[in-house]
Amino acid sequence: MFVSNQTFTGALGGLAGADQKCQTAAQAAMKKGTFKAWLSDETKGPSTTFVKNPRKYLSTSGLVVANNWTDLTDGALQSPLSVTELGVAAPGDRTWTTTSTAGAPQAGREQCTNWTSQGNSGNTGRIGATDATWTDDNKSPCGTTRRLYCFEQ
C-alpha cells in the first residue's frame, strides 16, 4: 500500500478512474498485482469493493500498517501510511477519501459528485496520521489537488 506520488483534483473519473490511477502508479513503480484507491462514493467504498485481506497490510517501506482487514478498519493504524509508490515520503498532507475508518462511504459527506467533478468539495484523510484522521479528517475543494491511498488487493 502506498500514497500516490501524483496529485489529482476531485474529478477522478469515479471510483474506477481512481482505481486506474493507483494501478498506473503501481505499474510505473514496477509493483505487481492489482491496486485500488481507498475511496468511497455515495454507495460504494472499500468495505464493499476491496478484498478483505487476512494478511498484513504493509507500507511501501515495509512497515506493518495493519495486521489484517479487521485491524485496518478498527479506527487506528499501527504505522503511518506516508510513503509513495517510489519509496519516498509523500509530500503534502491530504488524500481524497470520503471513507469512514470502517471502509464505508460517509453518508451525507461530499465526494466531488461521485469523484467526477471539480465543483463542491470532498472529504480527505491526513497523510501520516495513525488515528481516525488518516481517513476522516477534513474537506477540501474539489479543484484542489490531493493524493490517493492505494491498496494492493
For the regions a language model picked out, list residue spans one by one.
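Secreted/extracellular ectodomain signature
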Residues: 1-153
